[in-house]
């Protein structure tokens, strides 16, 4: 009994420490790059010197709305600047900015508060985009493109003819039901000169802190992948300290925020360079430089890459790049969070309600732990039967804790009681609790996911704090069903009496889905306790 209560307290402190540690990590990340892979940000990288700087492109990028090319599919609304062919606006059609409004969630944008765009171009000896030559001014056959009913693919061709007569066609390809955008350059070298070009793609983002809280930590910043490192965050602080410059086969570069991601994915079989920089104007850039292509006179060449702009949909991200789904970061318990997420999706596909799916997960976990729970309550019942003897020992030995401990161990051995027998179910629940916490925090499917009545979004805290209060009441009832051991010292008794209150206060700011899991778990535990105790009473254990 006493051990169980101590473990419960340790569990609370453990969870609190983990949440605080993760919050500190995301709010104050440490540089992770090594000297061999980066150069100081004050030094110009020779390989990226020709990539248009964020500040250099800024005046041209902020074009009037009537000059931008509009693209609409069933999933995306994009705006493309004909100067350079940059994607300067993206709205996610099926994702609302706020639950009670029809306004779509906007990811890429240019406003007074945030500058966040996707840029791509051709650099190199015959590149049409550079920091010195400026950007290519493309022409388009239309100012608006829409994916029509019955149409699965939409292409947006932009054309630029260089002074030497070479035609560069930049083609954006979008598909029904998808958030990825194919970006392809088709080069028709009608000149007598051999061309040498290199494609680049980069994401530019004004440095902005994530809107985190201790109970809802989120990450806003960059991330990348190479052949050696499948996934690594590279925060704005890292980018300001060091320029990233990693050569790799394949790879990708991304900007992350809560539930959403934008990412450039170059060809997996090409030798690419993942780079980053921070401009003097406060824009953070991360992207790739692709392989160098030679285009002989009278020939044509195609160079392409993929750009993703949308939710952190693990299936969609995995289809683009094997490791891109890792931007859904479940932390050190990812191995446990992944099956929990799968099971949550499985249940939801049947019941159609995320809250009910969480309840089913709770019942599943409690069912799996039932044999251990039964052993726990059996051990507790045996411990209760020993309370008179333990109380007698306390009176005999007084403050002599050493003799008291020795006598207790001898008694446990004689009566075949394991004082730690009630701890295992609690210890096993804590990793599940933490893993579910990160699933609720990271899985975009739970954003704006309703349950019932006043719970309209399981990914945020209960607006009226009803679930946390009910959870506190359930803990109080559980505590009343498990009388405190007489051997527990007064300080421990006071602490345990306050545990339901402490837990309730902590859970006020937890996502409603997580509180629902804990509340239902408590109710199931109370039911199991009554059933198990009824069986134990028949065996003479009370």
Curated annotation (Swiss-Prot):
One of its GO terms (molecular function) is membrane insertase activity. This is Membrane protein insertase YidC. Interacts with the Sec translocase complex via SecD. Specifically interacts with transmembrane segments of nascent integral membrane proteins during membrane integration. The keyword Manganese does not apply. Keywords: Cell inner membrane, Cell membrane, Chaperone, Membrane, Protein transport, Transmembrane, Transmembrane helix, Transport. The gene is yidC. Belongs to the OXA1/ALB3/YidC family. Type 1 subfamily. It is found in: Cell inner membrane. InterPro entries: Membr_insert_YidC, Membr_insert_YidC_N, YidC/ALB3/OXA1/COX18, YidC/Oxa/ALB_C, YidC_ALB_C, YidC_periplasmic_sf. It is a multi-pass membrane protein. It comes from the Bacteria. Pfam families: 60KD_IMP (PF02096), YidC_periplas (PF14849).
């Amino acid at each position: 009994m006493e051990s169980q209560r101590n473990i419960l307290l340790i569990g609370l402190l453990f969870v609190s420490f983990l949440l605080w540690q993760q919050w500190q990590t995301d709010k104050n990340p440490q540089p992770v790059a090594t000297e061999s892979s980066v150069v100081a940000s004050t030094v110009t990288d020779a390989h990226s010197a020709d990539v248009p700087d964020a500040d250099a492109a800024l005046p041209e990028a902020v074009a009037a709305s009537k000059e931008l090319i509009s693209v609409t599919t069933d999933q995306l609304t994009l705006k493309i600047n004909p100067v350079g062919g940059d994607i300067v606006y993206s709205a996610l059609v099926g994702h609302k900015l706020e639950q009670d409004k029809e306004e779509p969630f906007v990811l890429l944008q240019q406003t007074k508060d945030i500058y966040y765009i996707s840029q791509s171009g051709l650099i190199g000896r015959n590149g049409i985009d550079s920091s010195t030559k400026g950007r290519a001014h493309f022409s388009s056959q239309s100012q608006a493109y829409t994916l029509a009913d019955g149409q699965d693919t939409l292409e947006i061709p932009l054309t630029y003819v260089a002074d030497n007569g070479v035609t560069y066609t930049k083609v954006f390809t979008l598909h029904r039901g998808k958030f990825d955008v194919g970006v392809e350059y088709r080069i028709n070298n009608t000149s007598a000169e051999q061309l040498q070009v290199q494609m680049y793609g980069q994401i530019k983002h004004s440095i902005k802190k994530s809107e985190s809280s201790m109970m809802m930590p989120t990450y806003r910043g960059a991330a990348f992948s190479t052949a050696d490192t499948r996934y690594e965050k590279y925060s704005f602080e890292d980018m300001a300290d060091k320029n990233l410059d990693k050569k790799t086969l394949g790879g990708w570069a991304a900007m992350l925020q809560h539930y959403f991601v934008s990412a450039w994915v170059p060809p997996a079989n090409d030798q690419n360079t993942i780079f980053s920089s921070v401009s003097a104007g406060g824009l953070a850039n991360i992207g790739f430089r692709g392989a160098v292509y030679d285009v002989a006179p009278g020939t044509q060449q195609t160079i392409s890459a993929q750009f993703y702009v949308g939710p952190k949909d693990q299936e969609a991200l995995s289809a683009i790049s094997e490791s891109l789904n890792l931007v859904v970061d479940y932390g050190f318990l990812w191995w446990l969070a992944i099956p929990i997420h799968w099971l949550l999706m499985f249940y939801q596909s049947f019941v159609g309600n995320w809250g009910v799916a969480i309840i089913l997960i709770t019942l599943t976990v409690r069912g799996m732990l039932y044999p251990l729970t039964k052993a726990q309550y059996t051990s507790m019942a045996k411990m209760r039967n020993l309370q008179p003897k333990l109380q007698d020992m306390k009176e005999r030995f007084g403050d002599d804790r050493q003799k008291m401990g020795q006598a207790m161990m001898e008694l446990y051995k004689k009566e075949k009681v394991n004082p730690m027998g009630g701890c295992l179910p609690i210890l096993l629940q804590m990793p599940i609790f933490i893993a579910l916490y990160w699933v609720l925090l990271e899985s975009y499917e739970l954003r704006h996911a309703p349950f019932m009545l006043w719970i309209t979004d399981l990914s945020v805290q209960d607006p009226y704090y009803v679930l946390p209060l009910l959870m506190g009441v359930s803990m109080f009832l559980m505590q009343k069903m498990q009388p405190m051991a007489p051997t527990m010292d007064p300080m421990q008794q006071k602490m345990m009496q306050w545990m339901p209150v402490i837990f309730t206060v902590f859970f006020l700011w937890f996502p409603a889905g997580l509180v629902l899991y804990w509340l239902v778990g408590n109710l199931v535990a109370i039911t199991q306790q009554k059933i198990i105790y009824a069986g134990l009473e028949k065996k003479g254990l009370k």
